[in-house]
């Protein structure tokens, strides 16, 4: 009788799979909660303690670390000496190992999980069994994902049993599974410090001496930025982020869709108010806040209706009926939001080619972002850039009014809005806004004067009189500030820090502008 060992944290599909194994003549050996679940379903189960002759002990820390378990997994079926050793020591062969690991990643994703509790989610016996079975894939099937249960049963029904190729594919998945698991543990522990005689999570500054990225393939992409470039996308084991987003309708997401969705989310996450961002080539062409999602959407679209055509759009509120009506009135490529109301689904379905994606915005708020980029022969890693001032009422002690004229309340609110946006536009950038809507965006220019001129060109016949301007970095000379004033802005927010700050401040005073220094630069390359 073939023997299967089952020990899983994720019990989805477990009972049906175990019943399928039992129907095919397998003896079921199991541990702890898995055994209880199988017994409750009426399946015959051999307890792991009956196999080892030792009880499960130390709160389940020691269950499967025993020669009668690992010998049964590692014995090579084609080696007579291995089989003789197993027989001499009363070791029964194990033909199938079904294991998925303690939910460390889920526990680590919750900042409130205490360090001691997190340590208890580090699986020891599970990875050992998985690696042993994967090493001996020629004789043992190893299953780490419920998604493979049906395929395993189908393979078992083959006249000559599971193919060697299939066995190897399961082994490859198993090693990737344990590798990603160990990477998640190492990454989490890298952010732990010892302080006041206790371990504290998420407090380490800087980066470790080595980094291993544990990523799982989500799928192949049709192509990269251009048709001649092959592409795929991968995601961390984290339950949040674009890697966990759900596509409700439309074509498969493309490489550029994913880049633009990321850009859209980064912007709308800056706002507590209903917000919308229209993205083209990772730059916003329009962004706005409003009283509700539909209001924010329409205002963002009207900021640059020409560029809005074919854009990717992000919302930080559910798509309701009114928002859906506004969305289908525009030709856009993709929209992402926290959810879609049922009555809105039918409206959106009329644009069947439009991609509609949902993701949990609240969980994304807690996501610690790190930007990883490849350069020739190396990889660069940095903390993600969020405008932390977004949560602070303006004015605040972190901000410095450097001009003779103080900003009005309306200008303060408009600058706060503009500052949250300019961090997400390619440098050099100068943007013009009112209190709730972009008016003109000068993005990705080689000089700050050019950025202002591009913004003025984008504004066209629409006046920028009475607007505020935000610059992602300091004005190196007064010419950029003169251009801002000539465009019609009445207030400017910028980091400051130029050797020519005094000249720039003098220019602002000459024009009667109010100007605020934040002391923080927001380059985006």
What are the residue ranges of the model-derived segments?
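Glycine-rich nucleotide/cofactor/substrate-binding loop typically near the N-terminus or early
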Residues: 33-104, 196
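Non-catalytic interaction/clamp surfaces of large macromolecular machines
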Residues: 147, 151-207
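Mobile "lid/hinge" segments at catalytic clefts and subdomain interfaces of large enzymes
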Residues: 128-129, 136-152
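N-terminal glycine-/serine-/threonine-rich phosphate-binding loop
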Residues: 1-51
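Active-site/ligand-binding-proximal alpha/beta "capping" segment
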Residues: 77-127, 131-134, 401, 406-409
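Anion (oxyanion) recognition and catalysis
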Residues: 22, 39, 123, 134, ...
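ATP-dependent carboxylate/acyl-activation modules
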Residues: 1-6, 99, 181-183, 192-525
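Hydrophobic beta-strand scaffold residues
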Residues: 28, 45, 140-142, 356, ...
